[in-house]
Amino acid sequence: MYLENYKIEGSINNDTDPCFHDVNTYPLFQEKMEEFKKLLIELVDNNESKTFYKYGDGDYFFLTKQSVGSAAPGKRALSKGYININHEQFVEGAQLCDYYTCEIYPTNKDRFEQVIDRKIDFPAEYGYGLVANKWLFKQFSGKIGLIGADTKINIIENLMEAEQYQEYLGLEKFEDYVRLPQQFACDDLDATEKMVGEQLQKTSSKIFLMGMGHVKSGLIHRLKKYTDAVFLDVGSSIDAIAGIIDVNRPFFGDWTNYQINEPPLYEGVDFLQYDSSIGKHLVLERN
């Protein structure tokens, strides 16, 4: 069982990594979480436009042009080789956000320092836990939108038509849904920015939760051009809202994956490490 220091009330962490059993990994985990929550409230209340970049292990491989996992050409981020894109746009863009979060695994922190010349402001686990315990939804009700892969945003929109799911999240609705391609969004950064920017100009949300894959390295810092909002990268938390999260991801151990019994809605969806045989599931019926 992970230490009390690393608990986020209202969530369960199934991740067995030793870092969660060592108080020295991140001694101020609880104090910094309160600071993080206070900062978000302050930024939203003041209608400030700020960006939060969540670093994960895949970002290291993408930023160093290594064909590993999601960073491999033809897999998810790119349909073509690194030599065929302006990779420097992503490397430079990754340095230009306002705040940075990183999972507390020692390897991730070490690799972060190799590719991003900024300090880590907060553990990325906060973005998981505060979705898992619904704090973000309740705190920013009426002000919150989503940015993510088109396939997953479509699922979420359909789920949110059900009152039962609204009650589960503690949120009547998301104010805005902004879509980007699930695959190969890094092939043409400017085209992806244009697609997202045109949507953002029509939004009213004061805070966006985002999960956009590796294109974020070049894109996140550009979003402030289109609307004044807090852009919070929560990574795979978007998968949780879409009802397809791997419950062994940090702090989603008690999450219920709500789904709709309509197979076409899930065609072509990138399920990442999601396993439908593990965790709690609930199938919603259409009214």
Where in the sequence are the language-model features?
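A mid-sequence, solvent-exposed acidic-amphipathic segment
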Residues: 165, 170-207
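Conserved beta-strand scaffold positions in the cores of enzyme catalytic domains, especially
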Residues: 52, 146, 174-179, 231
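C-terminal functional extensions of proteins
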Residues: 215-287
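A short, acidic, amphipathic alpha-helical segment used as a generic capping/interface helix at domain edges
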Residues: 35-39, 84-88, 188-200, 216
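Short active-site oxyanion
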Residues: 142-144, 205-208
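Glycine-rich beta-strand-to-loop/alpha-helix junction loops that act as flexible
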Residues: 210-213
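Residue-level detector of flexible, active-site-proximal loop/helix-junction positions
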Residues: 107, 182-184, 238
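Electropositive, gly/pro-rich neighborhoods at or near active sites that engage anionic ligands
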Residues: 1-170
